[in-house]
Each structure stands twice: as structure tokens, then as C-alpha cells.
């Protein structure tokens, strides 16, 4: 909900659902043991809503990051239309990494925090 608010200025309501239950015209999150990779996910958009399934909570998290990055930058206060489709994604490697050369340059702590954030958010 917070990621959608950041991108659009709109805070969608959050509602808990029972296993197997979905809500129409909503973003539904779920777990799917059939997804092979622990961080893999399937993001499906239709006229009925958005479904993000991951094998684990991490997979759902990365699916949410993909949805967040799919929202146009100029979406603040505007209607958002996403094309219908399905994205199946999983990491190629079991690790994520970036390199920051702290040996030759001094970096303030705040910069390092901003540098590390994309590792978790995938963007």
C-alpha cells in the first residue's frame, strides 16, 4: 500500500482474505508453492485486477517491486491503466550485489544507505 501511495498519491485500502479468495478490482497477493524459485513470482494484470503470487514472501515482495516500477512516473493524481498480461520472473543467481569502492573515497552514511536501498527494492 505504501509503495502505491509513493507512486500515485493514492493509498489503496488493505483487506485480509481467506486462502484461495480474491477481490475484484484490487491488488491480490498470494503464495504459490508451484513457483520453482524461492524469490520467483508471477504478476498478472487483467480487467478484473492484479494478482501477485510468489513461492515465498520474498517472491511476493519482488513482484510488488515490479508493479511499482510499472506505474508511470507522472501517475501522481492520475488514473493508471496497465496493459493486461503476465510476468513470470525469478533471479538468475542466488545473490544480489553491487560494488562501492570505499577504499579510495569517503562516503557519508546517508549516501551508503541510499546506495544499498536498490538492492532490496530492485530499482
Model regions and ranges:
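Substrate-binding cleft of carbohydrate-active enzyme catalytic domains
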Residues: 91-123
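Contiguous, structured surface segment used for ligand recognition
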Residues: 1-95
